Amino acid sequence: MKMKKIHYILLIAVAFLVSNCDTNDDGFYNNVFVDVPNLVSIESPTTTYTVGQKLYVSSQFPRILNDGALIDIFQTTGANEFVFSYVIEKQINPTVWEVVTVNDSQLDIVKGDAQNGSFVYAICQYNTVSGLYEYRVGFPLLSTGTYRMSFGYNSDSKDTVELRSLSPATRLILNINSLITGLDANGFYNFTVN
């Protein structure tokens, strides 16, 4: 009988512990989310480009942002860099799109940094003189065809760019969801290269 009581007490204790677990990993990983529109843009958007032109994506935002309240993102995160991603695809046939890749050396990196593989890994770098996070990179358009670009390689969002701070290990990680204009209902910027 005594053994049965111990089992019941243990079972109740475990049930109590499990029922009070916090399943919100954001607090554990120090993640915070804010919404600030128009931090990333497609420069001079047009539906037609010519071979040899570059498609420029840019971002320039201050360290103090307004998400209903002013937040100093540099002081809060300690991050010198914020990252986001985008994908450029070329239409192979009516139902098949192929990711377009170029060597990193072919990217026209004006501000910030970028790495290209199956997507462009865009890095907005903090400019200590201006107090701005900056990114401006041109992607070379090397062949004719129908193209599309989308933001967020690992995202389901269709109208926002997700910027993430590269914060030191002990600091807050800030995720900024930024509405972007110029995309279709499926989240693509469509264009043709002649």
Residue ranges, per PLM feature:
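Sec-dependent bacterial lipoprotein signal peptides
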Residues: 1-21
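First exposed extracellular module after export/assembly in secreted or surface-exposed proteins
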Residues: 34-194
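Bacterial Sec-dependent N-terminal signal peptides
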Residues: 18-40
